[in-house]
Amino acid sequence: MNTPKSFFWAQEYFTPWDYTARAITRILAYRKTRFQEMLIAETGAYGKGLMLDGHWQSTTADEFLYHEALVHPALVQVVQAGGIPRRVLILGGAEGATLREVLRWRSVEQVVMVDIDGEVVEACREHLPEMHQGSFADPRAEVVIADALDFLGQTEPIWDAILSDLSDPVEAGPAYRLFTQEFFRQVRSKLQTAGAFVIQAGPTGPVELWQHTRIVHTLKTVFAAVQPYAIYAPTYGGPLGFALAAQDPISSRPEPEQVDQILAQHLDPDRGALRFIDGITLLGLYQVPAHLRRAIAAETTVYTLANPPQVE
């Protein structure tokens, strides 16, 4: 195997004692914005990637695992609850890849992406076309540079799905308020009857799952149904959790044939086939392992503005 002559290691810590290292071969953009530290770079093995505050958000090699898992289970849930995903709100999502996945749905008439950091959005638009694939220019898409909490307070309850594609909820970062009970109540009030909400919900590895269990437990104090699930993408160094929430029931054993039929009816074939999500994959994702089920059941902490997520 050929090793580049010039590179340096980008280290990402998961605990004070554990980190992963990824080789950076070229820096495409670096800056400290008003909200966070941003790096867009070419890596040795995983293509281009976005790093915020020292944490990888996505790389071109495996971002499809994350973005398909974030978007399509939620929109399938809307259909299964008797709705049609016409209006979708994305919170965060600077790379434009979440936007890309939403725009696969032919029923979508309007998708608004709200991100607090316009500098990061513009850098991703310039340097990560492999991720957004021109989605920012789609006439159905609108990008709003604003605080998601403020935007939600002003919007009407018109949304069929709200997708939270935010950086990790650390108190020093811009997103920690968006993982609290107060915020989840705001989200619920802005959804249509058959609407669904999905959130990136932290790592689910055995020594890191406390944040995930608290997010899921907090959601359960607000929504009638919550389905946790997780993916493994090498960029993140371990399993990463999500939580899907709705007022209608969410089947933990979705019928693969029905899911495949929904996807076939609603996805635009001109935008290419999904690489990760299908009926069998969704069924597998929803089978939460025993240790995680027990940890969620035992969780008692509720994230609030008075008791927000913190680094532990």
From Swiss-Prot:
S-methyl-5'-thioadenosine binds at residues 36, 115, 147-148, 174. GO terms for molecular function: spermidine synthase activity; thermospermine synthase activity. It catalyses: S-adenosyl 3-(methylsulfanyl)propylamine + putrescine = S-methyl-5'-thioadenosine + spermidine + H(+). InterPro entries: PABS, SAM-dependent_MTases_sf, Spermi_synthase, Spermidine_synt_N, Spermidine_synt_N_sf. It is found in: Cytoplasm. GO terms for biological process: spermidine biosynthetic process. The active site is at 165 (proton acceptor). Spermidine binds at residues 67, 95. Its EC number is 2.5.1.16. Keywords: Cytoplasm, Polyamine biosynthesis, Spermidine biosynthesis, Transferase. It is an enzyme of class 2 (transferase). It comes from the Bacteria. Pathway: Amine and polyamine biosynthesis; spermidine biosynthesis; spermidine from putrescine: step 1/1. PROSITE patterns: PABS_2 (PS51006). It holds the Pfam family Spermine_synt_N. One of its GO terms (cellular component) is cytoplasm. CDD domains: AdoMet_MTases. Residues 7-247 form the PABS domain. The keyword Hydrolase does not apply. Homodimer or homotetramer. HAMAP family: Spermidine_synth. Belongs to the spermidine/spermine synthase family. Catalyzes the irreversible transfer of a propylamine group from the amino donor S-adenosylmethioninamine (decarboxy-AdoMet) to putrescine (1,4-diaminobutane) to yield spermidine. PANTHER family: THERMOSPERMINE SYNTHASE ACAULIS5. This is Polyamine aminopropyltransferase. It comes from Synechococcus sp. (strain JA-3-3Ab).
